[in-house]
Amino acid sequence: MDLVLSAADYYFFTPYVYPATWPEDNIIRQTVSLLVVTNLGAYILYFFCATLSYYFVYDHSLMKHPQFLKNQVSREIMFTVKSLPWISIPTVSLFLLELRGYSKLYDDIGDFPNGWIHLIMSVISFLFFTDMLIYWIHRGLHHRLLYKHIHKPHHIWKIPTPFASHAFHPVDGFLQSLPYHIYPFVFPLHKVVYLGLYVLVNVWTISIHDGDFRVPQIFRPFINGSAHHTDHHMLFDYNYGQYFTLWDRIGGSFKHPSSFEGKGPHSYVKNMTEKESNSLAENGCKSKKLCNGEFTKNE
């Protein structure tokens, strides 16, 4: 995060905000700056990626599903807008520790004999390490003592949209993001890679709420995609993983997505629409409005 803060200091905070007597390495200044940068970045990333996903990826026919809530999209957005600032407070404390040199983040790929190989392996290990921890944290949040108070708000959205991706109780949101911050305190990680992975995990979180269940057949047994996560929202006790199905298989919580078997929400909406159309046809109606008497054939 020091790369982002350095740029923010150079282009904005130092010339326009803080007095010259307040040094850039002052811990209070760093804390305030990180709060601003973290919140601004979170909102931009959320709204930009979720909006693109909602308009260009999300299947809007899912909004016809009976479990899709009234005003759900606006409710998802408002929940997220209220939660992100609270999530940022403990997150900034971890960013501050990284900024002040307590993590194993590094700048120079040449610091390691096999620099590029180490960098590639660190990406792979990051994904598997965080996937493992998120699985157990997520599963723990489903315990009856925690679920009602912390995780239940996220399960309000049985048929989620991309805007539900970050609609968490603040404690829930922070706990599920914690593995990403733990990793660089345990393992060396390049600073640019860390920022890239931070963006990636947020985009992935949006993608598993986008209702697009298309996954190449060869990856279906391994990747925990939107189809898996939608079943988690609807059925509660399955598919806790973030990226992969590995820990769900180990933990006995894996469920083959119902959508891959033609039993998911898309199929439900399709069948519901077909039945509705057939019913209108049987009654000699060309449209729902005509059948409901909202206008006459002469109109």
Curated annotation (Swiss-Prot):
Keyword check for Cell division: no
Record's subcellular location: Endoplasmic reticulum membrane
Motif (Histidine box-2): 151-155
Enzyme class: oxidoreductase
Motif Histidine box-3 location, chain numbering: 228-233
Positions of post-translational Phosphoserine modification: S253
Keywords carried by this UniProt record: Endoplasmic reticulum, Iron, Lipid biosynthesis, Lipid metabolism, Membrane, Oxidoreductase, Phosphoprotein, Steroid biosynthesis, Steroid metabolism, Sterol biosynthesis, Sterol metabolism, Transmembrane, Transmembrane helix
Biological or metabolic pathway of the protein: Steroid biosynthesis; cholesterol biosynthesis
Catalytic activity from the UniProt record: a Delta(7)-sterol + 2 Fe(II)-[cytochrome b5] + O2 + 2 H(+) = a Delta(5),Delta(7)-sterol + 2 Fe(III)-[cytochrome b5] + 2 H2O; lathosterol + 2 Fe(II)-[cytochrome b5] + O2 + 2 H(+) = 7-dehydrocholesterol + 2 Fe(III)-[cytochrome b5] + 2 H2O; 5alpha-cholesta-7,24-dien-3beta-ol + 2 Fe(II)-[cytochrome b5] + O2 + 2 H(+) = 7-dehydrodesmosterol + 2 Fe(III)-[cytochrome b5] + 2 H2O
Keyword Phosphoprotein attributed: yes
InterPro entries registered for this protein in UniProt: Fatty_acid_hydroxylase (IPR006694), Sterol_Desaturase_Related (IPR050307)
Topology class, membrane: Multi-pass membrane protein
Cofactor requirements of the protein: Fe cation
EC number(s) from the headed UniProt entry: 1.14.19.20
Highest taxon listed in the record's lineage: Eukaryota
UniProt motif (Histidine box-1) ranges: 138-143
Pfam family name, one: FA_hydroxylase
Domain-level remarks: The histidine box domains may contain the active site and/or be involved in metal ion binding.
Family the entry assigns: Belongs to the sterol desaturase family.
Function recorded in the entry: Catalyzes the penultimate step of the biosynthesis of cholesterol, the dehydrogenation of lathosterol into 7-dehydrocholesterol (7-DHC). Cholesterol is the major sterol component in mammalian membranes and a precursor for bile acid and steroid hormone synthesis. In addition to its essential role in cholesterol biosynthesis, it also indirectly regulates ferroptosis through the production of 7-DHC. By diverting the spread of damage caused by peroxyl radicals from the phospholipid components to its sterol nucleus, 7-DHC prevents this form of cell death.
Name of the molecule in the record: Lathosterol oxidase
Source organism of this protein record: Rattus norvegicus
